[in-house]
Amino acid sequence: MTICCKDKQCSLSKIEHFHDVVGHCLAPHERLYADTILTLSSFGQIAEKQLLELEIRYDYVKIDKYVIMPNHIHAIIILEGAAGASPRPTLTDIICTYKSLTTRECNAVNKTMGRKLFQTSFYDHVITNEVEYQNVWQYINENPRKWGNDEYYI
């Protein structure tokens, strides 16, 4: 699943590449990807918190892998349980709620109202086998290191 910021605004994190990260102490809002440090902004920290809270809000949701890039979020979201067992929120419902809660909290922190943080739609893809799962997992894992070549890079 991929969610993009409105107008591709880089408001969630920043990415820096280093030749040598040995000895660099990471802050709680920083993530290390080989020679790359991803630093979450205050909005990115809210986006991460809300993403992880989806597992609490919906007992059948598992956030398996994710990355919060400067202007988009990638995640592997697993919807557990038997398909069609009972009516429950769909992935679209879950993402809509996620975007709404994240935007509302970011606007409260920024003391603005009505500002849109995300694009209206999102991209999803059903992973159908282990090879595809490994490819998507690896893509998410390597995305910060390849930021300069990313299709969402501006």
Please place each PLM-identified region on the residue numbering:
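Short catalytic/metal-binding and nucleic-acid-binding patches
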Residues: 2-154
